[in-house]
């Protein structure tokens, strides 16, 4: 899969995010919360040698081009006129996810106790800045 990313055989990276609680899963609803760790996995792939240029292209630029017909703005790059929706990663802040850190409705992660070489520290959604660890508003658009 890593070679497919580098050579372009894999067009884009995405994550499923089904933030069901453990109780809902036990009752037969399938799916796991993965959005909380997507940025951390990008840091891991970079740490394993996949260039950031490739990761940004596959996780942001290309998906935005593919799905642009469904949006009302220009997403996927950092250019004047683009919609400011992005994640800010600290690639030097290693962390191990703990249940108490999970921000999604699920309240758990399949990667609890898994170490990552970096993490998302801030998100920007349509120009509104949010602190990732607490989901606190940093700045309005």
Which sequence ranges carry the predicted segments?
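Phosphate/diphosphate-binding loops
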Residues: 1
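C-terminal cap of metal-dependent C-N hydrolases
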Residues: 80-141
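His/Asp/Glu-enriched, well-ordered alpha-helical/loop segment
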Residues: 4-7, 12-13, 17-91
